Amino acid sequence: VGHSMGGETIRMLAQLLENGDADERNASRDGSISPLFTGECRHWIESITTLCTPHDGSQYDTKVYQNIGDLAQYAMGIIGSVAGANVNENNFGLDFKLDQWGLVRQPNESYASYFNRVINSKIWTQHTNDLSVYDLDVDGAAVLNGYAKAQDDIYYFSVACSNTHRDPLTGHYLPNASMNPMMLKSSTYMGRHVNYAVGHVNITPEWWENDGIVSVRSAIRPHENSTDKYNENYGVGADGKMTFKAGTKMGVWNYIEK
């Protein structure tokens, strides 16, 4: 089960377990290759269920992709709003997991200093594809969709979330009163933004309904650059509960509900 970007992560894991990676195999002919990249781990995963996953990326992430500082500040604000006011700066429990870039919190380093070092790192200005923000960008997600395909021996299910409503006058989608205040800006932007730029994923009104950071359309299944089969009418049982239905096919995205 994967929530938000976790859904993209487990899709990639399934792709690697089932098929390995040709580039890794070609680069590791001395026997040092990890079994993860050999394609010898089929049938390790029975099913994949994604919750509010941006399979097609988030149009808001695309907006802030050019300014990673805004994205990080936004994420920190959400963390703070969830943690509450009583946050111990020296024991915040936050690890950016960027060790491979040398961005490790040093002994006795304050989180403020650690955070500033991360935000001011040169890795953000290189626009590398080896960062999560690329996979969350709509164009980057399309690349991932073309690589991490639905596997024919795995069941796929998805659940979307919405916390917006349609404005009858403009047709735009607006945040509900229950929306986390930190997501009002992103939700409002997503609920009216379109982009028809040539050479990029087109953002149409179909993307407007959202949960604050992920559009319902994106959470249903991979669309952009994807050949995955799908059933968008899988639904729930008569009792309103998720029920595994007879005849459910593997290798097919089954959309449950929002």
Predicted regions mapped to residue ranges:
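Short beta-strand immediately N-terminal to the catalytic nucleophile in serine-hydrolase-like folds
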Residues: V1-G2, L51
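Gly/Ala-rich beta-loop-alpha elbow adjacent to hydrolase catalytic centers
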Residues: G2, G6, I10
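Active-site signature of alpha/beta-hydrolase-fold catalytic machinery across serine-
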Residues: M12-L16
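Active-site catalytic pocket residues across diverse enzymes, especially alpha/beta-hydrolases
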Residues: L17-D21
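Helical cap/lid subdomain of alpha/beta-hydrolase-fold lipid enzymes
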Residues: D23-E24, D30-K258
